[in-house]
Amino acid sequence: TYDEDCLFLNVFAPDTAREGDKLPVLVYIHGGGFTGGCGHEKHFDGPVWPTKGVIGVTLNYRLGPMGFICLPELKEEAGFTGNYGLYDQMTAIRWVKDNIEAFGGDPDNITIMGQSAGAMSVQQHCLSPLTDGLFHRAIMSSGGGVSKLMTPASPEKFYDFWHAVMANCGCKTLAEFRAVSPD
C-alpha cells in the first residue's frame, strides 16, 4: 500500500460457503495514520471470521501522497482532488456489495469496521452520500468521532502545501511530479 498499485482485497469465507448462503459480511479498514498499514495486518486475524460464520474482507487503499494529494491540476483532470484513499475504500466496499454473494455473503448484511485511521474512514463513509446503501452497520475502534483531523476543509487550503512539495522535488508541472519515483 505504499504504491499506487495496491488496490487488492482479501476475502475470508468458510470452506463450506456457497452462493446463496447469505452469511453476514465484515469489511475491515486498516489504520496507520493514512500513511502506513495494510489489509493483511497480523494483529487483525481475518481467517478467524469464517470459523464464526462471518465472511471477512480486508482491503488496501492508497496512502500518504498517493492517497491524499490535493492539487488544482488534478481537480481540472478529474473533477475532484484529494481523498483518493477514501475513494479506493468506497470502491472496494462497492465491489463487496456487488460480488460478495459469489462467496456466500449477504450483500444486504455488510458491516464496515475500522481501527484508528480506519475508524476515521468508517466515520467518513457513514457521512458520505457516495456510500449510501453500500453497508448497513459500522464499527469504529480507537478512532473516529469528532476530531480536528476530520474537520472538513476546502481543497484550496492544501494547494500551497502540495505545490511546495512539488517544488521540493524539483517539479514545476504535474507531469514532472508524476515522473518522480515515490521512493
Task: Tell where the protein language model's regions lie, with residue ranges.
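Serine-hydrolase-like catalytic core of hydrolytic proteins
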Residues: 1-174
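Short, Lys/Arg-enriched alpha-helical recognition elements, typified by the DNA-recognition helix
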Residues: 180-181
